[in-house]
Amino acid sequence: MPARLETCISDLDCASSSGSDLSGFLTDEEDCARLQQAASASGPPAPARRGAPNISRASEVPGAQDDEQERRRRRGRTRVRSEALLHSLRRSRRVKANDRERNRMHNLNAALDALRSVLPSFPDDTKLTKIETLRFAYNYIWALAETLRLADQGLPGGGARERLLPPQCVPCLPGPPSPASDAESWGSGAAAASPLSDPSSPAASEDFTYRPGDPVFSFPSLPKDLLHTTPCFIPYH
């Protein structure tokens, strides 16, 4: 027993001496306290620093929403402006198209009036339609061209009429025309060159809209014999 007590006392003495030697070392609690003081002095802790961008992003979210709303407003304004611009463009194009069509019709009517002025005259209360005016002018020009062709060939008017007209029309012809009568010579050439007597003529009988019972159109500026004996003018009687 005394030996054991001596060993315990010696151990305690050694521990006290070693504790006095290790007094310069820090304990765990003191080490943690010093680390906390150093971290607080140097700045916020690492988790706080990591959370800083999240806070800034949260503060930037309202600004981003405002920018998005502003962009949507601008898009809506642009859409409204574009629709108004398209409407104005369509309206201006429609107005221009109407003006072009109106000018075209005015020019067409003026040209037809000029054509009617050079054709054989009609009564004041008679006015041909557009297609009738064109057909009549075509036949009139064709008869004049055939008259000039026969005049160049030197064929006598009566002989040409008898040779070119159908046989059933020959007994209805008047007597031989006078050489000094320009109107009768024109009538003989027109009768010889009638588009109704020539199958190759482009103006066929079915092209005319007149019936045999239609009213007779009078031509004050031309002789009556010429109008009644020229088959190309029969549809207009």
Swiss-Prot record:
GO terms for molecular function: chromatin binding; DNA binding; DNA-binding transcription factor activity; DNA-binding transcription factor activity, RNA polymerase II-specific; E-box binding; protein homodimerization activity; sequence-specific double-stranded DNA binding. It comes from the Eukaryota. Coiled coil: none annotated. It is found in: Nucleus. Residues 35-83, 175-209 are annotated as: Disordered. GO terms for biological process: auditory behavior; axon development; cell fate commitment; cochlea development; cochlea morphogenesis; craniofacial suture morphogenesis; exit from mitosis; forebrain development. Expression restricted to the embryonic nervous system. GO terms for cellular component: chromatin; nucleus; perikaryon. InterPro entries: bHLH_dom (IPR011598), bHLH_transcription_factors (IPR050359), HLH_DNA-bd_sf (IPR036638). PROSITE patterns: BHLH. Residues 38-53, 180-207 have a biased composition (Low complexity). Residues 92-144 form the bHLH domain. The keyword Transcription regulation applies. Pfam families: HLH. It is linked to Cranial dysinnervation disorder, congenital, with absent corneal reflex and developmental delay: An autosomal recessive form of congenital cranial dysinnervation disorder. This term defines a heterogeneous group of neurodevelopmental disorders caused by a primary disturbance of innervation due to deficient, absent, or misguided cranial nerves. PANTHER family: BASIC HELIX-LOOP-HELIX PROTEIN NEUROGENIN-RELATED, NEUROGENIN-1. Efficient DNA binding requires dimerization with another bHLH protein. Acts as a transcriptional regulator. Involved in the initiation of neuronal differentiation. Activates transcription by binding to the E box (5'-CANNTG-3'). Associates with chromatin to enhancer regulatory elements in genes encoding key transcriptional regulators of neurogenesis. This is Neurogenin-1. It comes from Homo sapiens (Human).
